[in-house]
Amino acid sequence: NKQGGGYGDSEIYMRGFDNTNVATMINGVPMNDMENGNLYWSNWAGLSDVTRIMQTQRGLGASKVSAPSVGGTINIITNGLEAKRGGAASYQIGSNGMSKTLFTVSSGMSKKGWAFTVLGARVQGDGNAQGLNYEGYNYFVNIAKRINDAHQLSFTAFGAPQKHFQRSSSSALTLANWSLVEKKYGVKNYRYNATYGVDANGKQYSEDYNVYHKPQISLNHQWLINSKSNLSTSAYLSIGRGYGYAGEANDADYSDVSYKTLRGANYGALNMTYRNADGTFDYAAIKANNAAGEYGSKVAMTKSLNYHTWYGLL
């Protein structure tokens, strides 16, 4: 389910429940945001390339996982000792300027019980609408040791630094408005983005822009106690660093330029305030207006930082 047409902005629904009510884990470590329960899949780009198995559980109940949830539970298990020896490299191209370069190498388990897997990839593209270009990297490293038949250790580190533009979900364009957009600008199937544009220097802007990197490091110990019992212990560390931009403006009652200026339509009519001939947002005019304003800027980009460090023992 794409949100705003942005890279990696997707959702998972299980039994009708959204991300906030579905516990998602990677190797048994919870991934949902601790404050609101959301899950940001752009932080885990490339995870499918190293996924060994996926475990799912519907609703609450007896479970081996650390965080059961009313909607259900998803546990993604990545490659480890089971990975076969070998390697691969690939280059993929797709629609909307998408390209992806990837390599992966696995040693397989040695006679002394060691194994490693390494993956690296880069993806870029223009997005499926105007001004939604993105760029991302992802990496994965796993080093595993089979100590004996009862014990094994696994060290895993992965992350996906990325930056991408989004199309605002609050553009206020109805189905009728989309038809008006095509007629107004004379472009059939116009993949319009109401807040996309450039300034006088050609720098790209959009109301929604995201930059983030949230690597995770974990150490897992598996102990097979007997044929009926086993104990899994994981220590993990996750460091999130990034930010997002959003457009802000004065209240409509106090300014000729308001937050509605950023929308694609107002009360059913296309918004023509600060628009270029092709419908893109005129950020050059906005900057000039702000500079000349007697009481400061009327429209501004806010930068919201999200810095956090998670760690735990399961």
What are these regions (language model features)?
Residues 89-93, 118-122, 155-161, 235-239:
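Transmembrane beta-barrel strands of outer-membrane/channel proteins
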Residues 19, 110-112, 146-150, 226-228:
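Outer-membrane beta-barrel channels and translocator barrels
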Residues 103-107, 141-145, 217-223, 233, ...:
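Residues on the lipid-exposed face of transmembrane beta-strands in outer-membrane beta-barrel proteins
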Residues 1-30, 46, 52:
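Extracytoplasmic beta-strand/coil segments of soluble accessory domains associated
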Residues 63, 72-109, 119-130:
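Short strand-turn segments of transmembrane beta-barrel domains in outer membranes
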Residues 12-13, 30-58, 77:
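Short acidic/polar hinge/loop motifs at secondary-structure boundaries
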Residues 4-6, 66, 94-97, 131-135, ...:
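Short sequence motifs at beta-strands and strand-loop junctions characteristic
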Residues 144, 152-222, 245-305:
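Acidic/polar loop-and-plug regions of large Gram-negative outer-membrane beta-barrel proteins
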